[in-house]
Swiss-Prot record:
It comes from the Bacteria. GO terms for cellular component: cytoplasm. Its cofactor is Mg(2+). This is Molybdenum cofactor guanylyltransferase. The keyword Zinc-finger does not apply. Pfam families: NTP_transf_3. The gene is mobA. Monomer. Keywords: Cytoplasm, GTP-binding, Magnesium, Metal-binding, Molybdenum cofactor biosynthesis, Nucleotide-binding, Transferase.
Amino acid sequence: MSASPSPSITGLLLAGGRATRMDGADKGLQLLDGTPLALHVLRRLSPQVDETLISANRNADRYAELGAPFDARIVADETADFPGPLAGLLAGMRAARAPLVACAPCDTPYLPADLIARLHAALDAQQADIAMAVTVDAQHARSPQPTFALLRTSLADDLAAALAAGERKVRAWYARHKTVEVEFRDERAFYNANSWHELAALARR
């Protein structure tokens, strides 16, 4: 999609976490095949949305540089204690110019090219508040992927209240709203790097 004065979907790259399992390193800036993970994701996410935001609580200048080719804006959490992806999601919902926000984490370089289209179709068909990706493996086991989702920005005030009340679990907050699950059979598309070992594994895939 191309940017427009009244976009319909805002893409949100979630890059604001602590990365405790990577010794605090900024995950989105780690290299895969010589390219920062965040840039891999931006190249796949941005063509699917009308505007792009990057949720980043540190290294904002570096993320702004990576996001420049996509006219991406940087947003930071409203709180300084790294309360998790819900805080990044809230910052994105507040900053979005569109009525819908599509989020994806910064360490998933193979996300599907049809991710947003499929989430949007399900959201509309079910008149849901949230559409969330779920992977299904060869044994039909389902694995929810809550940070791959499409949400209505009208939920921002409720999310702010939930965060203020201490909620930190993404799926627990989703459960308060009408959420539709969208199945994806390509597990590889959702592989991520939560640790140095997983980053090395990504490079071998």
